């Protein structure tokens, strides 16, 4: 592509069914065709995740991974990691959006110097969320789309935000959010639409099942 590797940020995850496979990180590097991963996460608090976390710590020491983190872990599980780790997780990837802003979780993460990465940042594309009157009003005021207003809210909430996009025009629109700023009152108005609504329900049974599911990773090359 002509772009230096240092200019590209590669983030990926370890799947629970492979948590106890010592060579899985090396296999991941091979599949990605890279010498190192910028951010590696544990996908779910399933299976032997403490063992997998130790493997990630070793990968950091060996220069194969720059930073490590967690995905879909709750406070108790994160604390278990913190109590037993040598290298602290830098990021928690978890569902976060205006209907589920993760207020309490963010307080816990802030105390432990862990950043939140918002998964489902647009509420899984829920039109009810995206078309909330407050977003339509602010979109008209700032000359932006409702989606751009939501993404700007994430930025001002200090969330790392990862909206999915395949079309070039959508990618450009997603990053065209740094030439305006929501006021404190507008942020409060958005906070008022919190419904404590999740789109992903990680029941104990569902999470446990992930450790038994082995996707064909080689087939995904």
What positions do the PLM features span?
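Active-site catalytic pocket residues across diverse enzymes, especially alpha/beta-hydrolases
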Residues: 1-2, 85
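Conserved hydrophobic residue
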Residues: 3-4, 65
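Conserved H-loop
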Residues: 4-5, 88
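A short, structured active-site edge motif that brings together acidic residues
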Residues: 5-19, 38-45, 72
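Beta/alpha (TIM)-barrel catalytic core signal, keyed to glycine-rich beta->alpha loops juxtaposed to Asp/Glu
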Residues: 16, 44-221
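CE4/NodB-like, metal-dependent polysaccharide N-deacetylase domain
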Residues: 21-42, 58-62
């Amino acid at each position: 592509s002509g772009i230096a590797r240092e200019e590209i940020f590669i983030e990926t995850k370890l799947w629970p069914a492979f948590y106890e496979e010592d060579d899985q990180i090396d296999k991941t590097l091979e599949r990605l065709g890279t010498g190192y991963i910028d951010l590696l996460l544990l996908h779910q608090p399933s299976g032997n995740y403490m063992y997998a976390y130790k493997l990630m710590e070793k990968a950091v020491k060996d220069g194969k991974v720059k930073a490590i983190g967690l995905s879909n872990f709750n406070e108790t599980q994160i604390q278990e990691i913190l109590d037993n780790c040598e290298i602290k997780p830098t990021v928690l990837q978890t569902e976060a959006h205006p209907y589920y802003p993760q207020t309490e979780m963010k307080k816990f993460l802030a105390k432990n110097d862990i950043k939140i990465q918002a998964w489902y940042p647009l509420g899984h594309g829920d039109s009810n969320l995206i078309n909330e009157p407050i977003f339509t009003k602010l979109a008209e005021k700032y000359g932006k789309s409702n989606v751009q207003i939501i993404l700007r809210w994430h930025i001002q909430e200090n969330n790392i935000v990862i909206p999915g996009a395949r079309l070039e025009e959508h990618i450009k629109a997603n990053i065209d959010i740094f030439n305006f700023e929501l006021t404190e009152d507008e942020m409060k108005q958005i906070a008022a639409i919190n419904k404590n609504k999740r789109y992903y329900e990680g029941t104990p049974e569902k999470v446990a099942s992930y450790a038994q599911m082995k996707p064909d990773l080689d087939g995904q090359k």
